[in-house]
Amino acid sequence: MPSRKFADGEVVRGRWPGSSLYYEVEILSHDSASQLYTVKYKDGTELELKENDIKPLTSFRQRKGGSTSSSPSRRRGSRSRSRSRSPGRPPKSARRSASASHQADIKEARREVEVKLTPLILKPFGNSISRYNGEPEHIERNDVPHKNTQEKFNLSQESSYIATQCSLRPKREEVKLKEIDSKEEKFVAKELAVRTFEVTPIRAKDLEFGGVPGVFLIMFGLPVFLFLLLLMCKQKDPSLLNFPPPLPALYELWETRVFGVYLLWFLIQVVFYLLPIGKVVEGTPLIDGRRLKYRLNGFYAFILTSAVIGTSLFQGVEFHYVYSHFLQFALAATVFCVVLSVYLYMRSLKAPRNDLSPASSGNAVYDFFIGRELNPRIGTFDLKYFCELRPGLIGWVVINLVMLLAEMKIQDRAVPSLAMILVNSFQLLYVVDALWNEEALLTTMDIIHDGFGFMLAFGDLVWVPFIYSFQAFYLVSHPNEVSWPMASLIIVLKFCGYVIFRGANSQKNAFRKNPSDPKLAHLKTIHTSTGKNLLVSGWWGFARHPNYLGDLIMALAWSLACGFNHILPYFYIIYFTMLLVHREARDEYHCKKKYGVAWEKYCQRVPYRIFPYIY
């Protein structure tokens, strides 16, 4: 394999594609397979160039002043001859310059132009800040003829490809991207003979979660796994040796009244969401420059829900019904989630291309899972944003309260157990914190990258309320007496986790809002080509995702309150660790694509991902 000539970070001069002009560039990286250098121009443009198009700075010598010209005798014209020339004849110099210009045009038109085409993904980027499409780049070669050429494009399916048109000028070059409609279209020549390129089909996008087979198994496996966990937890001995648990008849899992109660709960949260209370903020920019508006009233919805629940308890409403029909409620939520996912996919088929998610792929099964439309809305009602925090997260707290009351009734207690109080208090703090800092949700991957499909619908409406309340559900049938010294240690652990979690998130959010805040002047950063800075000190110099570390420490505290008799209550911390490690890998992939060399420097400065000195 030939050795590379230029090193990373070396400042050289690179030829602008399609011209003979060289500009000062910095070598970013080198691909040994394609033998292409990734370079960065002074204006921030990053391109891939061949080694022949790159020259060291020493090969360019400053030219002396003055210009080449004809001999002095030719420069000096005779005034008498000038006066005797026929007025109708053009000057000799004008004829010569016109001829030279014509020959230059011919040479310019016959020059072989090499343009690097970067095909866009078959869908827009939605809220993606980086605007990077994540697809490989390739080179198209063409010989430009003297006369204009017009070629037709054949496009497949719903996709639109990108043709690159170069308009070269002596001092100004620009690359224009023009979207080709699904029908045939012709280009009109402008200053230079315009070339149209036959764009080759884009290779299949790399899919997450194991691709189509992976998401297919997840969609069918997660609901089954959820019900097996709940059935195991209701057994007297939830040991793994007793797996699988006895399965109830299918007709016993469905009850229309339960489904009606769940719909009522969902509609109540919709009403609270639509109330004109709370401030309105703008989200991150979409691909077309729009910024959607969001009303931050999640905390108010929680207060109103608490008032409704308190009034219901005072009126004597029997909440034990939820515990005794817990499996039926889980099934009702699952059915509702599937129906909602079908609706979301069907409506996304008519959504404008600019409204599609950057995570979608064009495959029906995968897009049904990951979500095809980025921000599905009915008027001003944002379905994804609503489901992220309202029905599931607030429902989690309500279910915990139901389990606390069920423990008192089943175990004949005058007051709840200390373990149940710890679990309820810890998780209540977690939910209130999320609702109080609702605006931070607008910059998460769920909002700016993932569409709204089965993955988020099932996670928000089923997995969160019925799995995150698993410790409280476990304690109803398997009491655990926690001593006060042990409880004190658990509280300290929870407090440490919360300080890390909230401190890291608050620091990140404050820096995003105002990087020039004097209170943040002590923080060190790395500048990126996107214009943004990466924090490399404070909490974010400790690990790349210190908020994940705090989250996991808090999750461990929730599980410790359940004792050590069974591994079942520790399922949450095991699952949550796997979830955050996978999410960190997704973040790593997108940030590397977005920030490039700056992200590599950041990883050198902050080598640990989540667990300092471990991972």
From Swiss-Prot:
One of its GO terms (molecular function) is NADPH binding. The modification Phosphoserine is found at residues 59, 67, 71, 86, 97, 99, 128. The gene is LBR. GO terms for cellular component: cytoplasm; endoplasmic reticulum membrane; nuclear inner membrane; nucleus. It comes from Pongo abelii. It holds the Pfam family LBR_tudor. Its EC number is 1.3.1.70. It is a multi-pass membrane protein. Residues 53-109 are annotated as: Disordered. GO terms for biological process: cholesterol biosynthetic process; neutrophil differentiation. Pathway: Steroid biosynthesis; cholesterol biosynthesis. This is Delta(14)-sterol reductase LBR. Keywords: Acetylation, Cholesterol biosynthesis, Cholesterol metabolism, Cytoplasm, DNA-binding, Endoplasmic reticulum, Lipid biosynthesis, Lipid metabolism, Membrane, Nucleus, Oxidoreductase, Phosphoprotein, Receptor, Steroid biosynthesis, Steroid metabolism, Sterol biosynthesis, Sterol metabolism, Transmembrane, Transmembrane helix. Coiled coil: none annotated. The modification N6-acetyllysine is found at residues 55, 594, 601. It is found in: Nucleus inner membrane; Nucleus; Cytoplasm; Endoplasmic reticulum membrane. SMART domains: TUDOR. The chain crosses the membrane at residues 212-232, 258-278, 299-319, 326-346, 415-435, 447-467, 481-501, 561-581. It catalyses: 5alpha-cholest-8,14-dien-3beta-ol + NADPH + H(+) = 5alpha-cholest-8-en-3beta-ol + NADP(+); 4,4-dimethyl-5alpha-cholesta-8,24-dien-3beta-ol + NADP(+) = 4,4-dimethyl-5alpha-cholesta-8,14,24-trien-3beta-ol + NADPH + H(+); 4,4-dimethyl-8,14-cholestadien-3beta-ol + NADPH + H(+) = 4,4-dimethyl-5alpha-cholest-8-en-3beta-ol + NADP(+). The keyword Transcription does not apply. It is an enzyme of class 1 (oxidoreductase). Phosphorylated by CDK1 in mitosis when the inner nuclear membrane breaks down into vesicles that dissociate from the lamina and the chromatin. It is phosphorylated by different protein kinases in interphase when the membrane is associated with these structures. Phosphorylation of LBR and HP1 proteins may be responsible for some of the alterations in chromatin organization and nuclear structure which occur at various times during the cell cycle. Phosphorylated by SRPK1. In late anaphase LBR is dephosphorylated, probably by PP1 and/or PP2A, allowing reassociation with chromatin. The modification Phosphothreonine is found at residues 58, 118, 200. SUPFAM superfamilies: Tudor/PWWP/MBT.
